Design a protein with these regions (language model features):
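Rossmann-like flavin
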Residues: 1-66, 236, 261, 265
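Non-transmembrane alpha-helical segments in soluble domains
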Residues: 1-4, 18-25, 44, 87, ...
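General small-molecule cofactor/ligand-binding pocket signal
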Residues: 55-57, 96-98, 289
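Helical element adjacent to the flavin cofactor pocket in flavoenzyme catalytic cores
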Residues: 60, 65-135
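A glycine-rich dinucleotide-binding beta-alpha-beta segment and adjacent secondary-structure elements
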Residues: 63-66, 70, 104-109, 286-362, ...
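Glycine-rich loop(s) and the adjacent beta-strand/alpha-helix scaffold that form part
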Residues: 92, 106, 117-190, 356, ...
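FAD cofactor-binding and catalytic pocket of flavoenzymes
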Residues: 156-281, 288, 313-327, 347, ...
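A conserved FAD-binding loop/helix module that cradles the flavin
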Residues: 362-383
Length: 388
């Protein structure tokens, strides 16, 4: 409702979107895990002791067998990526995919996009520049590449100026018992007590990732790696109130330049989140907690943890990550602040649409995948109905 009011998005009520969420969940086989790994169980124990509201995360991982390869490609095919379900379904309905093609430029002609200029890589690795004509063009290159392509093509109004993320701070926790987080999927319980500003949950774990998370204070922490079986990693994620920009690189490079300015509110929420997460983990049985903050010592007592409820973490020493990016081409009827209308049509063009993470007008404060897919399907249905 906040987005509807601020950006004047048409037909954006929960009851309008619900069928699209349901369709996406059905086709991705979204469900709760049958068994919770030890890294989840200890976290859940802390949540219950703190008395906080939480939920078990549903996953698009049909028949998961805990190979812990989610981030690099499931060897069993359990993770329901696009290649497992929606691409085969699209091909069944007549969609043709041109692979090895990289769109370099949108071709503009009198208020329309007549096609794209693409670089095609042949089997012998030679490349050709080709023109592909189209009656309608949908750009779905994600929160960073969609605005880069539009700006490279001379389309700049409210494009790439409102880049947003969910800043995340990770911690490693050392327990007395063996957790063996390296042998299972990431912890699957999320604390929602402080949502939408702050979320607490579990992070992907390998020995290499553990070493990276300890590297901010490596001289003090390096011996911990040999205790990896008794360790797990968790995160604080905040909604993100800062703003950033996305710009295409110069001189023909395919890279994008990303900039995000962490706000003072972000720092405050990250600090409070660290205090709460550390307290939860200590309650759950952790001996010590190691934040990804350079110069910050390990946290061994609740008194040390709650210090950050009132104090701010040193901004320059934070090692933050994110896996959620969005809002670079916001949609809505407010042409003074949006790049596209309520259904993704780019202002100033009759036949150019965006339909990906870039169109979310603001930070959702949750994993945006479901929202992106539901809104994209809604927009596609509207396009089809409008063209009949």
């Amino acid at each position: 409702m906040r987005w509807t009011k601020q950006f004047e998005i048409d037909e954006f009520r929960p009851e309008t979107l619900e069928p699209h969420f349901a369709w996406c969940e059905e086709h991705l086989h979204v469900s709760k895990a049958k068994d919770l790994p030890p890294s989840t169980e200890v976290f859940k124990r802390g949540v219950e002791l703190m008395g906080w509201s939480a939920r078990v995360v549903q996953r698009a991982a049909k028949d998961c067998v805990n190979t812990n390869a989610c981030a690099s490609g499931c060897p069993k095919g359990a993770k329901q990526g696009m290649t497992r379900n929606l691409i085969p379904l699209a091909e069944k309905w007549g969609v043709n995919f041109v692979t090895g093609a990289k769109v370099k430029l949108l071709i503009k002609e009198r208020g329309r996009i007549s096609g794209v200029l693409a670089e095609i890589q042949r089997e012998d690795r030679t490349t050709d520049l080709v023109r592909i004509d189209a009656e309608y063009v949908f750009v779905c290159a994600g929160a960073t590449q969609t605005p880069a392509l539009l700006r490279r093509s001379g389309i700049r109004s409210h494009v790439g100026d409102t880049f947003q993320i969910h800043p995340m701070l990770k911690v490693a926790a050392l327990f007395d018992e063996e957790i063996n987080a390296q042998d299972s999927v990431m912890p699957m319980v999320q604390v929602k007590e402080f949502w939408p500003d702050i979320s607490l949950g579990g992070s992907f774990f390998t020995v290499g990732h553990l070493a990276m998370n300890l590297s901010d204070n490596w001289l003090e922490n390096r011996d911990l790696v040999k205790h990896y079986r008794k360790m797990a990693t968790y995160y604080v994620a905040v909604r993100g109130t800062g703003k950033g920009t996305v710009r295409p690189a110069r001189f023909g490079s395919d890279y994008s330049h990303l900039k995000y300015e962490l706000s003072s509110v972000d720092v405050r929420h990250l600090s409070q989140g660290l205090a709460r997460l550390s307290t939860l983990l200590l309650q759950s049985g952790a001996k010590s907690v190691y934040p990804c903050v350079q110069g910050l010592p390990k946290i061994e007592t609740e008194l040390e943890a709650v210090t950050w409820l009132d104090q701010d973490l040193p901004r320059k020493n934070l090692s933050l990550t994110t896996v959620h990016a969005f809002s670079t081409c916001p949609m809505g009827e407010r042409a003074d602040k949006c790049a596209a209308d309520s259904y993704g049509r780019v202002f100033g063009f009759d036949n150019l649409y965006i339909n990906d993470a870039s169109m979310l007008p603001d930070s959702p404060g949750i994993n945006p995948q479901g929202t992106i897919m539901a809104v994209a399907r809604r927009n596609a249905h509207h396009f089809i109905a409008e063209k009949k």
